[in-house]
């Protein structure tokens, strides 16, 4: 992804802040050798390293879920969707680095920009689906474990990936700024309008997640109070348990906001002439979200930890005793 119209990745025109796309071409141009490939800057290398770490983490999660028959519950399908999306995002960052600095292919770079847009959109959409699943598991606790839940999960996955695919195809098909550099946003070759659409979609998802987590906190507090009364627990015990649950939800939502809000706001405020360094500084935390998602939604789960331990000890995951699971465990 050529992160800014003034970015070193964007092959700057001499004396201007616009992108000279014509400098990316075949090995031999019509009048001689093509321009040399750009040299990566420190932040380009950092993004590539981040993509590598993201790919490795999420590939491990995908392998665990696919290779463990016990992980076929709806909640693990959603976590698997999140891991696949983040895996694609990590691979997209690495391949884009290669496309820009090793191959010099503008066409490949454009396709990878679409892949990254699709992957990050699917990642955020999967986070929303996980939040919806958590809420419904508490709100409809008695009917959650039914065929309806499985059907609903597949519907949510279809909507998430269908929407992500649509937004990812837009820059590849036509909605880009290759022919009109003045319409570029902070991420070349995505147009300003495309970035605005993505930003609005993010704020809608974030608003829904805020509302759902607020409802989850209310339900958790009410359930904890009822359990405390039934078991005659001390108020202090009820308070500690409730506070711990709310703190966990706050960490989950806070991490998501801290990673994505800076870049989303910058997409709305910046344009093609904005300093590319700001794009890197706001985009890098967004990639960290794909890095911490496996920790929050997979590796904290005790059953996943058992599988990891079994793999390290060369044991079969089919022999591992799994406890009953609920979405709140993920």
Curated annotation (Swiss-Prot):
The lineage of its organism: Eukaryota, Metazoa, Chordata, Craniata, Vertebrata. It is a multi-pass membrane protein. This is G-protein coupled receptor 3. It is found in: Cell membrane. Keywords: Cell membrane, G-protein coupled receptor, Glycoprotein, Lipoprotein, Membrane, Palmitate, Phosphoprotein, Receptor, Transducer, Transmembrane, Transmembrane helix. The gene is GPR3. The keyword Transmembrane helix applies. Belongs to the G-protein coupled receptor 1 family. Residues 1-42, 99-110, 174-198, 273-277 are extracellular.
């Amino acid at each position: 992804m050529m992160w800014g119209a003034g970015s070193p990745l964007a092959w700057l025109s001499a004396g201007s802040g616009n992108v000279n796309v014509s400098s990316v071409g075949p090995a031999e141009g019509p009048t001689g050798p093509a321009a040399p490939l750009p040299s990566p800057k420190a932040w380009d290398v950092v993004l590539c390293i981040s993509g590598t770490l993201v790919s490795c983490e999420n590939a491990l999660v995908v392998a665990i879920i696919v290779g463990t028959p016990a992980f076929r519950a709806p909640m693990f399908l959603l976590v698997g969707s999140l891991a696949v999306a983040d895996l694609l995002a990590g691979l997209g960052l690495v391949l884009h680095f290669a496309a820009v600095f090793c191959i010099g292919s503008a066409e490949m770079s454009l396709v990878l920009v679409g892949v990254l847009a699709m992957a990050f959109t699917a990642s955020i959409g999967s986070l929303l689906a996980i939040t919806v699943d958590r809420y419904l598991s508490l709100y409809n606790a008695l009917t959650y474990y039914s065929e309806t839940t499985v059907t609903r999960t597949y519907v949510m996955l279809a909507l998430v990936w269908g929407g992500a695919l649509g937004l990812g195809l837009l820059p590849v098909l036509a909605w880009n700024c290759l022919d009109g550099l003045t319409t570029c946003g902070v991420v070349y070759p995505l147009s300003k309008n495309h970035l605005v659409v993505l930003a609005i979609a993010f704020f809608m998802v974030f608003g829904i997640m805020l509302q759902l987590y607020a409802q989850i906190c209310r339900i958790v507090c009410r359930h904890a109070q009822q359990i405390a009364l039934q078991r005659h627990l001390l108020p202090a015990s009820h308070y500690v348990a409730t506070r711990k649950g709310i703190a966990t939800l706050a960490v989950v939502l806070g991490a998501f906001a801290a990673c994505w809000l800076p870049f989303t706001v910058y997409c709305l405020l910046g344009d093609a002439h904005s300093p590319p360094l700001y794009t890197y500084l706001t985009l890098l935390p967004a990639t960290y979200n794909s890095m911490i998602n496996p920790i929050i939604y997979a590796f904290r789960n005790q059953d996943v930890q058992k599988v990891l331990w079994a793999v390290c000890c060369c044991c079969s995951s089919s022999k591992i005793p799994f406890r009953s699971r609920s979405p709140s465990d993920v």
